[in-house]
Design a protein with these regions (language model features):
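His/Asp/Glu-enriched, well-ordered alpha-helical/loop segment
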Residues: 67, 79-164
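Short, intrinsically disordered, charge-balanced linker/junction segments flanking boundaries
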Residues: 169-174
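Conserved protein kinase catalytic core
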Residues: 20, 107, 168
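Active-site core of metal-dependent hydrolases
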Residues: 1-80, 92, 97, 102-104, ...
Length: 174
């Protein structure tokens, strides 16, 4: 993370506080440095969630292989670390942008809502999580003047839902 900040990147995807030996180690000083920067952070937490759901569903249908059991255990620990990490980064004030990696591995197309819900689970309010999936990506790409919010003169795709996503993000799946 520090090397990326030193290099002057605009965004970091799949940001994680892992040491070279693979052990998880959150570093508040680095988190504060990231929060003070103009760098956008894309956690892509939904990808790990999709893998855990897939393996849990398999486990309910049949006995998992040893490899699958090990992957589920690693993914569960990684997911817990990721949620704790991004919760701490939200508290530090890091600029989060939603991104899903959908279509890769076990993450299906059409479930960007899962990433928004993951951002909410990490500590963003429902509206902040929605912004992280709409306004923030446009701002991160430098195209907020033409997309990212519903305003006169801007292009927009609208999702009409049965409910109030500021109260319940689950209605984004309607």
């Amino acid at each position: 993370i520090n090397a990326a900040l030193d290099a002057g990147v605009d965004a970091i995807l799949h940001c994680a506080f892992y040491d070279n030996d693979g052990s998880y180690r959150f570093d508040q000083k680095t988190a504060d440095r990231l929060a003070a920067s103009e760098v956008w952070l894309n956690p892509t937490m939904g990808l790990g969630n999709a893998n855990r759901v897939r393996l849990a569903n398999l486990k309910s249908e049949r006995k998992l292989t040893q490899d699958e059991e090990e992957r589920l255990e690693r993914s569960t620990v990684s997911g817990e670390n990721s949620l704790a990490q991004f919760s701490a980064l939200v508290k530090a004030g890091v600029k989060l942008v939603g991104g899903s990696d959908c279509g890769w591995s076990y993450y299906p197309f059409g479930d960007f809502q899962g990433e928004i819900m993951s951002l909410h689970a990490a500590g963003l309010s429902p509206i902040q999580a929605i912004y992280a999936g709409t306004r923030s990506p446009a701002a991160a790409l430098g195209i907020l003047e033409s997309i990212g919010t519903v305003e006169a003169g801007k292009e927009a795709d609208l999702l009409v839902v049965n409910g109030d996503p500021s109260l319940d993000l689950e209605c984004l799946r309607d």
